[in-house]
């Protein structure tokens, strides 16, 4: 009979190995496509300028960390977590403590380690802070001189503005500064911080299987505490918001290059969310004024950053151009109207001056016929008296009066006075240069003293007046009385010519006898 050896009992299960197998096993059912690589938590950055030793920093913390371990490399929560370095306890391994990056598995292992002194339960003393990194930060905040701190802030703002062109927008210091800074760059209004916080906490709860590995306290308690509006934000929330808005989150701290960058799941060309970290307790928004970022990451279809501002600017420019064109057209119309009014005024002035000049000329011409008509009246009266004398004389006297020795008197006797009010129309007087017996017999003195010579200017003026339009004198048309007077004058002239011929015939007959 063969005796079989005793079967060795199976080795006790290693909690660390089980944890590693559970962490590296099948993918979680809650994980999404493009899942994050499971890696050890990232180390945290030590705040520069803190020369205290590891033991001193350990004694200064309000709530001691639950253990320490050397980090295995940079994780998905960024190139490095914010906060000051927390040294190892007991064994003094020379690595940096990863703070809130501790997983539950590592807490269990470290609590059972040789240098561990037991778990220190979390207290509510620092409920307003984040996880263990801000417990430490709150205890290790440097007490700088106010003047030095203000000078440092001013230098930081000036350097960032000169080299990068960025502007630091101050956020309200009420515990929600991180969410205010993100809301300012996503929504354009820091008062939307409550919406950003709610979305961030909901995202953390939906991905609790992943983010719970980087929280040192109960994850539900952590989320409930972070839902309070006065609770500070942490690098875990930054990573969640980077994935939620699919925009990188860059953190600047007294330098022109970001000290930490949190990336989303998918890489794109969207403008990152930039925040600045001040005095280890406050976040502000860092804005690029030359590039629009509001609305990026909200999932709006066909959204173009800054398109609304460009549309408003184009509309404002178009409105301004239209208003300017209308103003110029109005000015041109005003100038054209003034020019037309000036021309009309000039034309009216010229017409008025011309009319006044014409009235003066007419007045002068009217004065000259009056004098001539007075002379004509006296000459007519003399002719009438001569006719009366001629009619009262004897034939001998009449023959004597008609002799060639008195030609002027004979011409005056031949004139018959016109009817009063009727115009006197006579033929044009003979030219002085024309040959004829009358011109040879008359002298210059006789023509000057003859009443017929004085009638010539009046007759010429009257002929000119008859050829003029009646509207020049304010009349619509010539009256019939004028025409009748002209006919009567012509009849009188024929009568005088007949009398003259008969007289000459009578005078010539006695001479022949």
Swiss-Prot record:
Segments for region (His-loop): 277-282
Enzyme class, spelled out: hydrolase
Entry annotated with the keyword Hydrolase: yes
Reaction equations catalysed: Thiol-dependent hydrolysis of ester, thioester, amide, peptide and isopeptide bonds formed by the C-terminal Gly of ubiquitin (a 76-residue protein attached to proteins as an intracellular targeting signal)
UniProt keyword list: Hydrolase, Protease, Thiol protease, Ubl conjugation pathway
Region ranges (Disordered): 1-75, 99-136, 387-446
Cys-loop: region residues: 171-177
Protein name: OTU domain-containing protein 5-A
GO molecular function, one term: cysteine-type deubiquitinase activity
Record's keyword annotation contains Protein biosynthesis: no
Domain OTU: 166-289
Similarity-based family: Belongs to the peptidase C85 family.
Active site (catalytic residues): 174, 177, 282
Gene Ontology terms describing biological process: negative regulation of canonical Wnt signaling pathway; positive regulation of TORC1 signaling; positive regulation of TORC2 signaling; protein K48-linked deubiquitination; protein K63-linked deubiquitination; proteolysis; regulation of immune response; response to lipopolysaccharide
UniProt organism field: Xenopus laevis
Cysteine disulfide links: none
The EC number(s) this enzyme carries: 3.4.19.12
CDD domains the UniProt entry points to: OTU_OTUD5-like (cd22752)
Chain segments carrying region Variable-loop: 226-236
Entries under Gene3D superfamilies matching the protein: 3.90.70.80
Function field: Deubiquitinating enzyme that may function as negative regulator of the innate immune system. Has peptidase activity towards 'Lys-48'- and 'Lys-63'-linked polyubiquitin chains. Can also cleave 'Lys-11'-linked ubiquitin chains (in vitro).
InterPro entries given in the database record: OTU_dom (IPR003323), Papain-like_cys_pep_sf (IPR038765), Peptidase_C85-like (IPR050704)
């Amino acid at each position: 009979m063969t005796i079989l050896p005793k079967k060795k009992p199976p080795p006790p299960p290693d909690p660390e190995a089980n944890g590693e197998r559970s962490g590296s096993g099948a993918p979680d059912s809650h994980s999404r496509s493009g899942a994050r690589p499971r890696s050890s938590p990232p180390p945290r950055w030590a705040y520069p300028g803190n020369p205290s030793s590891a033991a001193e920093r350990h004694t200064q913390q309000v709530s001691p960390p639950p253990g320490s371990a050397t980090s295995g490399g940079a994780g998905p929560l960024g190139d490095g977590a914010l906060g000051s370095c927390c040294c190892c306890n007991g064994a003094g391994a020379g690595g940096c403590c990863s703070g809130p990056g501790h997983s539950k598995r590592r807490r269990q292992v470290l609590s059972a380690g040789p240098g561990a002194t037991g778990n220190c339960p979390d207290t509510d003393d620092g409920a307003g802070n984040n996880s263990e990194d801000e417990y430490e930060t709150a205890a290790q905040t440097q007490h700088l001189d106010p003047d030095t701190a203000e000078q440092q802030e001013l230098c930081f703002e000036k350097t960032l503005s000169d080299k990068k062109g960025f502007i630091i927008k101050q956020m309200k210091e009420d515990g929600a500064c991180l969410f205010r800074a993100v809301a300012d760059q996503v929504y354009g209004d820091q008062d939307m911080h409550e919406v950003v916080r709610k979305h961030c906490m909901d995202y953390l709860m939906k991905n609790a299987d992943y983010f719970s590995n980087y929280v040192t306290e109960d994850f539900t308690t952590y989320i409930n505490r972070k839902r309070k509006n006065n609770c500070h934000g942490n690098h875990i929330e930054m990573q969640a918001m980077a994935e939620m808005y699919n925009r990188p989150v860059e953190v600047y701290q007294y330098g022109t290059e970001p000290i930490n960058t949190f990336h989303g799941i998918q890489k794109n060309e969207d403008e990152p969310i930039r925040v600045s970290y001040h005095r280890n307790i406050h976040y502000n928004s860092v804005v690029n004024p030359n590039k629009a970022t509001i609305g990026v990451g909200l999932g709006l279809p066909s959204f173009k950053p800054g398109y609304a501002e460009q549309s408003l600017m184009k509309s404002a420019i178009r409105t301004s151009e239209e208003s300017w064109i209308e103003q110029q057209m109005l000015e041109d119309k005003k100038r054209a109207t003034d020019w037309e009014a000036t021309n009309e005024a000039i034309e009216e002035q010229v017409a008025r001056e011309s009319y006044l000049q014409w009235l003066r000329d007419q007045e002068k011409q009217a004065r000259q016929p009056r004098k001539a008509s007075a002379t004509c009246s006296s000459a007519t009266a003399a002719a009438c008296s001569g006719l009366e004398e001629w009619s009262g004389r004897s034939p001998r006297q009449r023959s004597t009066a008609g002799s060639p020795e008195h030609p002027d008197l004979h011409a005056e006797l031949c004139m018959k006075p016109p009817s009063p009010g009727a115009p006197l129309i006579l033929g044009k007087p003979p030219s002085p240069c024309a040959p004829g017996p009358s011109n040879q017999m008359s002298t210059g003195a006789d023509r000057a003293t003859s009443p017929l010579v004085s009638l010539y200017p009046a007759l010429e003026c009257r002929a000119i007046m008859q050829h003029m339009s009646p509207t020049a004198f304010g009349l619509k048309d010539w009256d019939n009385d004028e025409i009748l007077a002209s006919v009567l004058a012509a009849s009188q002239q024929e009568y005088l010519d007949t009398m003259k011929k008969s007289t000459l015939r009578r005078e010539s007959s006695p001479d022949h006898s």
